Amino acid sequence: MLYLSNTLYISFKYQEEGEYMHFNVKEDILQLTPLWKGERFEDGRPKVSDEDIAELKKLTQEQIWESLWENDYKNQFESHLMQIHEDDRKLIGRAVTAAYIPSRPDLFDVVEEIGHSEGRKGTHNLWVVDKLVDGDVAVVDMYDKVYEGTFVGGNLSTAISTNTKTGGAVVGGGIRDIEQISKIDNIELYYRGNDPTPIKDFVMTSYNAPVRIGAAVCLPGDIVYGYKGGVLFIPAHLVKYILAQSKKPHVKDI
């Protein structure tokens, strides 16, 4: 596997004809999440059960945060985000992660070649949206770019709604078409800001690898818990522990 700086995470594999690269590599995801012992998706992501996700939804951010903090997971919360629906709904689902950086011609050509070899079509944001499934939440590091950094607009938000049913996205960057998106009832988006410009001048550097959203770190398969402008990323292997802890009496604030 190849790391270039903090953001480029492309896996190298080997065949008789030589070296080649891939995004969203199962073996990499397995290495990143060894503490998860349960069911997994075909791509290797931890698959926390629907039942456990439903139980998490009953908890407050503070209940979850306390268990994370006690286990030294102190970089799991980000609050400097906007959200589409200003009501009491929660966004909870399994993370699909992606990261991007400003484009440059040689790197863009390399990434395009990788994507085409994997059958990916369209722009690099579409590569992620197209593959989302029920209950997924896209967690996207767009390097806080808002102007020309609009990861989704109305059409891709509709696609997220169709693919995930109850999911959404957390975007460390921009979105557009907020009037149209706000009318999609079964989706929730957290984002840095909105702008009417279309997305451009960006290139994918990782897909289902570790990403950063502000002060928080997310791995593929983490459970995303969003409420009122704040988002927690819950390691899959801690979900059972958090649910058990929530049933114990607590008599003081930390």
Predicted regions and their residues:
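Short acidic, Pro/Gly- and aromatic-enriched capping/linker segments at domain boundaries
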Residues: 21-39
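Phosphate- and other anionic-substrate recognition elements at nucleic-acid/protein interfaces
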Residues: 44
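Short, Lys/Arg-enriched N-terminal segments with co-localized hydrophobic residues
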Residues: 8-20
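Feature captures the catalytic cores and cofactor-binding loops of soluble hydro-lyases/lyases
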Residues: 40, 50, 56-220, 226, ...
